[in-house]
Regions:
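Conserved glycine-rich beta-strand-loop-beta hairpin in the small C-terminal domain of fold type I
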Residues: 226-229
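ATP-dependent small-molecule kinase catalytic core of the GHMP/sugar-kinase superfamily
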Residues: 2-33, 115-219, 232-272
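DPxDG-like acidic metal-binding loop motif
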Residues: 93-124, 135
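Short hydrophobic alpha-helical segments that form membrane-spanning helices or hydrophobic packing faces
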Residues: 105, 231-232
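Short, well-ordered alpha-helical segments
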Residues: 61-65, 103, 240
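Canonical bilayer-spanning transmembrane alpha-helix
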Residues: 222-223
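Short, basic/glycine-rich phosphate-binding loops at helix/coil junctions
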Residues: 44-61, 105, 127, 188-194, ...
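ATP-binding N-lobe of GHMP and related small-molecule kinases
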Residues: 1-93, 110-120, 145-147, 165
């Protein structure tokens, strides 16, 4: 059988680094929403061997292989699957592409094979894969603390959003290693402060140029550790007009923020 699932991007409406933990991770505070945009994943079972097809990411580096290793260890899951990932979310962009892929496949397999993994267990597996995976399993807009895995649900206005994708790649690991001067500003639903914005603008020229352009038209913010920049609007026409006047080489588009991840509805009727 063949299954098609969404793997949406997330947006960080602010990101405040609180302190470094004893396990070398950082405690953070952030607000998550999802985008009505992202990758598509196609899962085919009844195949002779497992295969991951994703031209943007080398097989051995694909997070899905790590997911399969964890599932084998945790629940002895050994099904052979062919998975094709149609990538739209750039790597190292602050939109959670790999984490979303892993969460979507995990959620789908739990339904397809009736694995009966509780949400608590799914979140535990997600955290083994990475700090951003749990939010895609949770699937609802929220304020997140801890490593980003402790959730307090909130309902936000779903709004048109202009997304700017600089060519710059920013490694989350490197961002935390190199940015030591975390600003103590507060973060809330009206102040989308990001602890990495000043550092990213200083160290990545293209990121700064994109900020300088969009800030002539509207407020703009960094998502996660970057490099994606976003700007929220009250209507599509306004956002689209600004997008249409973007510099010719700037990669940008308009979509909508969502409070609920699409995959939660998609997998309801899956099963074999």
């Amino acid at each position: 059988m063949n299954f098609k699932i969404s793997s949406p991007a997330k947006i960080n409406l602010g990101l405040k680094v609180l302190n470094k933990r004893k396990d070398n991770f950082h405690n953070i505070k952030t607000i998550f929403q999802f985008l009505d945009w992202g990758d598509k994943i196609y899962i085919e079972n009844e195949v002779s061997e497992t295969e991951i097809i994703c031209k943007e990411i080398e097989n051995e580096k694909n997070i899905i292989f790590k997911l399969f290793r964890i599932l084998k260890k945790e629940i002895n899951f050994e099904e052979k699957l062919k998975i094709h990932i149609d990538k739209k979310i750039p790597t190292q962009s602050g939109l959670g592409g790999a984490s979303s892929n892993a969460a979507s496949v995990l959620l789908a397999l739990n339904k397809i094979y009736n694995l009966r993994l509780s949400k608590k267990k799914l979140l535990e597996i997600g955290l083994l894969l990475g700090s951003d995976v749990p939010i895609f399993i949770h699937g609802k807009s929220c304020e997140a603390t801890g490593r980003g895995e402790i959730f307090k649900n909130i309902v936000l206005e779903e709004k048109p959003i202009l997304i700017i994708l600089p060519d710059s790649k920013i490694s989350t690991l490197e961002a935390f290693k190199k940015n030591k001067n975390f600003d103590p500003q507060s973060l809330n639903e009206k102040n989308f402060f990001n602890s990495f914005e000043t550092w990213a603008r200083k160290n990545f020229e293209e990121v700064n140029k994109c900020f300088e352009w969009i800030e002539q038209h509207n407020d703009a913010y960094l998502s996660g550790t970057g490099s994606t920049i976003y700007s929220l609007f009250n209507n599509f026409d306004e956002a689209s007009k600004i997008m249409d006047n973007a510099p010719s080489k700037m990669n940008c588009f308009v979509t909508t923020t969502l409070n609920n991840s699409k995959i939660l509805n998609e997998i309801k009727n899956y099963g074999v």
